[in-house]
């Protein structure tokens, strides 16, 4: 299994960091694309260094390297997650405006009919945001808002983050124990 992980410049960068860590723990290869603003969010929202985040990925790709294999629809992978996904990124993908590698990889993921999961954290949403997400859902993307559930009785922020990351892994049928799934015994 090989997954593309895009980190865009939305608040909630901890979701992307946790996904990279979970993929590493689960022996899933990850190809990371991080925008400049995402790197800034790492500094603003966490105690991580950007190099620490990059070290969680199997491979790191420059966001403006259009010679990367990720810029081709022929690049074999399981799918792509953009987590967190800014409204700018959603708009770019929805309009087919691929001016960086993250947007181009998302475009390739859609056109090749692979799983594309977008995790927006923005709130509130305006009509333009909703229309862009509706267009992407119609094109085959999964919109998974960073809106954690509470049925698993979270005790810490990490429980809330793990719930969303677990939902992403569920879409790709990746077994995990990040949250208690209703109907399954807690392991």
Specify the residue positions occupied by each region the protein language model found.
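A cross-family phosphate/adenosyl-ligand binding-site feature
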Residues: 1-117, 123-184
């Amino acid at each position: 299994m090989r997954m593309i992980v895009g980190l865009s410049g939305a608040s909630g960068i901890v979701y992307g960091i946790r996904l990279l860590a979970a993929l590493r723990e689960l022996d899933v290869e990850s190809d990371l694309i991080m925008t400049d603003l995402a790197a800034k969010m790492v500094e603003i929202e966490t105690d991580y260094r950007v190099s620490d985040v990059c070290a969680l990925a199997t491979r790191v790709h420059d966001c403006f390297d259009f010679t990367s294999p990720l810029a081709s629809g022929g690049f074999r992978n399981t799918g792509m997650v953009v987590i967190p996904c800014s409204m700018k990124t959603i708009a770019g993908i929805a309009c087919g405006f691929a001016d960086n590698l993250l947007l181009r990889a998302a475009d390739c993921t859609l056109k090749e009919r692979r799983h594309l999961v977008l995790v927006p954290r923005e709130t509130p949403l305006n009509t333009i945001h909703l229309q862009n997400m509706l267009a992407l859902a119609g094109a085959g993307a999964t919109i998974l808002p960073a809106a954690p559930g509470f049925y698993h009785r979270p005790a810490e922020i990490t429980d809330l983050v793990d719930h969303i990351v677990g939902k992403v892994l569920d879409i790709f049928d990746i077994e995990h124990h990040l949250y208690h799934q209703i109907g399954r015994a807690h392991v």
